[in-house]
Amino acid sequence: QLHEHGLALKNQGDIDRQFLAGAISTGTHGTGINLQNLSASVLGLQLVLASGDHVQCDKANEADLFEAARLGFGSVGLITAIEMELAPAQVLREGGWQANLDELVGQIPALCERHERFEFFWFPQSDLATIKTIEQVEEEPQYPLAAEGQRQAFSFEVLPSHRPNRHTEMEYSVPAELGPECLNSIARLLR
């Protein structure tokens, strides 16, 4: 519905099957070193607390409650309304390719700087990684939509990923400068 009003989320995860309140309160994020998770765009919340009280909160009113609730995994209360900072609707172009993991690891910092959104998926049973980049473009969407990795369309059509394969996904938080060595250590352990 945002698109009908010329608007979009500033960032979103690559899974679009959850409710907005759940995506916000779990820290759902996309990729990009200069993009924040969804909770950073929240300006205000309406909550129903365990006591049954209805509370409206933001940075000026009930600020501590607001900060706890917007990334609180639902522990503070039930989110019943959200006020968010939005972006104008945008066309994104997706690119993708495969590379050898060992070669890719040394390029990660440069790829993060070069691309608005950069991510990769490594398949531990092989030496290959699938790379995905997404850039905002000042061009028209291209329909019908191309295959994933080649789409050029509005953000809500490009950012979600199709996941037909069963998989287990894990996310770790390490300082960015230690990321390549951390990945190399995991790869050595699994090989």
Which residue ranges define each predicted feature?
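Noncatalytic alpha-helical scaffold of FAD-dependent oxidoreductases
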Residues: 1-191
